[in-house]
Amino acid sequence: MSEKQQSSSIIEEFGFPAEVIQLLDRTGVTGEVTQVRVRVLEGRDKGRILTRNIKGPVRLGDIVILRETEREARKLTTKR
């Protein structure tokens, strides 16, 4: 197995690294979840920009590991 194939199988086993490029909003009952835009750094969707919800502290430039890159978070709506 070549080194490139081995590294891609490791990435798919643990998740896909993505960089936080924009903080959008906070959600959840107490604001514990942050909606962010991330750019996928490796894997089959490399370069794709996704909207995801992240629980816990997060800053611009952070690297997060996504288990999958198929789903996107829904846009937040405000109650009237």
UniProtKB/Swiss-Prot annotation:
The keyword Ribonucleoprotein applies. Pfam families: Ribosomal_S28e (PF01200). One of its GO terms (cellular component) is cytosolic small ribosomal subunit. Keywords: Ribonucleoprotein, Ribosomal protein. One of its GO terms (biological process) is ribosomal small subunit assembly. The keyword Ribonucleoprotein applies. Disulfide bonds: none annotated. HAMAP family: Ribosomal_eS28. Belongs to the eukaryotic ribosomal protein eS28 family. This is Small ribosomal subunit protein eS28. It comes from Metallosphaera sedula (strain ATCC 51363 / DSM 5348 / JCM 9185 / NBRC 15509 / TH2).
